[in-house]
Amino acid sequence: PDLVFFALTDDAKLNRYNAKAPGTVEASLTLSGLSIGEKLLSIDFRPATYQLYALSSNSRLYTINLTDGSLRVVGTGFTPVLNAQVANIDFNPTVDRIRLVTNTGQNLRLHPETGAAVATDGNIN
């Protein structure tokens, strides 16, 4: 199928692929706006606005400009802070909130407009 998807690289790039040729990078954007040592861990599109969001290792959310690769921080960061090396975000379109889970069991809900944690749920086992 003619389906576009995106992936992060370890060197702060966002690659675009097509499912017709998943091994071929169609385009690559160098991402700008991270602090020194900060990494992006996960991305997901917000269904309500079609914006691409990213989670950083510094417990912050960003939106990604798909034209120039610039990052815009959302809020000032969230608490409790990440206590993991592996994390994933996923939008719940029904309530327009971000689910954040980590390899250490953290399970948070984040607000896409403020970047704040709005709920801490039970640990994921």
Pin down the residues of each PLM region.
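N-terminal carbohydrate-binding/catalytic regions of secreted carbohydrate-active enzymes
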Residues: 15-59
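Short loop/turn segments that connect beta-strands within beta-propeller blades
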Residues: 19-22, 65-69, 111-115
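A short beta-strand motif characteristic of beta-propeller blades
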Residues: 26-34, 70-80, 116-125
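Residue-level detector of Asp-centered blade-edge/turn motifs that repeat once per structural unit
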Residues: 1, 45-49, 91-95
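Conserved beta-propeller blade signature
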Residues: 4-8, 50-54, 97-100
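Repeated scaffold domains used in trafficking and secretory/extracellular systems
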Residues: 37-44, 77-93, 125
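Loop/turn residues immediately N-terminal
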Residues: 11-15, 58-61, 104-107
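An edge-strand/N-cap motif at the start of beta-rich repeat modules
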Residues: 1-21
